[in-house]
Amino acid sequence: MPRRPLLEFEKPLVELEQQIEQIRQRARDSEVDVSPQLHQLETLAARRREEIFKSLTPAQKIQVARHPHRPSTLDYIQMLCDDWVELHGDRRGSDDQALIGGIGRLGDRAVLLIGHQKGRDTKENVARNFGMATPGGYRKALRLMDHANRFGLPILSFIDTPGAYAGLLAEEQGQGEAIAVNLREMFRFRVPIIATVIGEGGSGGALGIGVADKLLMFEHSVYTVASPEACASILWRDAGKASEAASALKITGPDLLSLGVVDEVLPEPVGGNHWAPLEAGEILKEALTRNLEGLLQLSEDALREQRYRKFRAMGQFLDDLSPEALMAE
């Protein structure tokens, strides 16, 4: 088994991981039965990892969300769907590789799947622009969502981006307009939409495919108006205060659930989704199937009205009203 990169706060596990690897190597090189010793060390490592991950700070959760081995949109699509056909292009000369989409089947139901896609290494990250979509990417997503709306396909989106690409060319090509049009049109769609934050959900880049009837996020994912580094640079002119900004921004699942921004926080395997991708895929599949079945019971008008009220309730503050009460108004 290839060794996974350990995060800074996992360093107390380094010695245990080294011992486990040495025992595995010994087992490969000889016929000595080391399974009892190996089981004991693996159990100890799992227990210590569970203790560490139960008390992560927001800044540490960001590290987990950005882990290079964390499952990506394509990884989840392959786990969710037996059949998957990727669709390309925005029909305006662009086929952004940072935002992908296509048709697949969740169980026996045809669905549209779209999402940000990061790379596994430097070369792939450059090709995918580190998951930062250009205007062409958001226009491609809109074209595919229009297709889904026309043919009655539920839309499943997967959010994993530090933000929309903010380069000069992206601004010249209308980045703000592309995202704004997506927001407007997603409110009008007559089909169920479920968005899931699988890694980091940053700013307008996340919102561009994030207007949904149900917004889910994994336990160690983050969803934020701006990255903590950017926030610290803007407020304090010091990116070194990113950890302080992360706590103030309320970017974690429990905080966002209490604020009414997300609808469900999905548990992760001990150590994060990168430690057990298949288990993470099963958790996601169950949540998507369950939420989709509920949404399919609603009429088109009820879907759109509920979606509108959900987002109108965000950002309002009244002493005597909870987010649930605001949505009921």
Curated annotation (Swiss-Prot):
Pathway: Lipid metabolism; malonyl-CoA biosynthesis; malonyl-CoA from acetyl-CoA: step 1/1. The keyword rRNA-binding does not apply. It is found in: Cytoplasm. The keyword Phosphoprotein does not apply. Its EC number is 2.1.3.15. One of its GO terms (cellular component) is acetyl-CoA carboxylase complex. GO terms for molecular function: acetyl-CoA carboxylase activity; ATP binding; carboxyl- or carbamoyltransferase activity. Residues 40-294 form the CoA carboxyltransferase C-terminal domain. Gene3D superfamilies: 2-enoyl-CoA Hydratase, Chain A, domain 1 (3.90.226.10). It catalyses: N(6)-carboxybiotinyl-L-lysyl-[protein] + acetyl-CoA = N(6)-biotinyl-L-lysyl-[protein] + malonyl-CoA. Keywords: ATP-binding, Cytoplasm, Fatty acid biosynthesis, Fatty acid metabolism, Lipid biosynthesis, Lipid metabolism, Nucleotide-binding, Transferase. GO terms for biological process: fatty acid biosynthetic process; malonyl-CoA biosynthetic process. PANTHER family: ACETYL-COENZYME A CARBOXYLASE CARBOXYL TRANSFERASE SUBUNIT ALPHA (PTHR42853), ACETYL-COENZYME A CARBOXYLASE CARBOXYL TRANSFERASE SUBUNIT ALPHA, CHLOROPLASTIC (PTHR42853:SF3). Belongs to the AccA family. Acetyl-CoA carboxylase is a heterohexamer composed of biotin carboxyl carrier protein (AccB), biotin carboxylase (AccC) and two subunits each of ACCase subunit alpha (AccA) and ACCase subunit beta (AccD). Component of the acetyl coenzyme A carboxylase (ACC) complex. First, biotin carboxylase catalyzes the carboxylation of biotin on its carrier protein (BCCP) and then the CO(2) group is transferred by the carboxyltransferase to acetyl-CoA to form malonyl-CoA. This is Acetyl-coenzyme A carboxylase carboxyl transferase subunit alpha. It comes from Synechococcus sp. (strain WH7803). The lineage of its organism: Bacteria, Bacillati, Cyanobacteriota, Cyanophyceae, Synechococcales. The gene is accA.
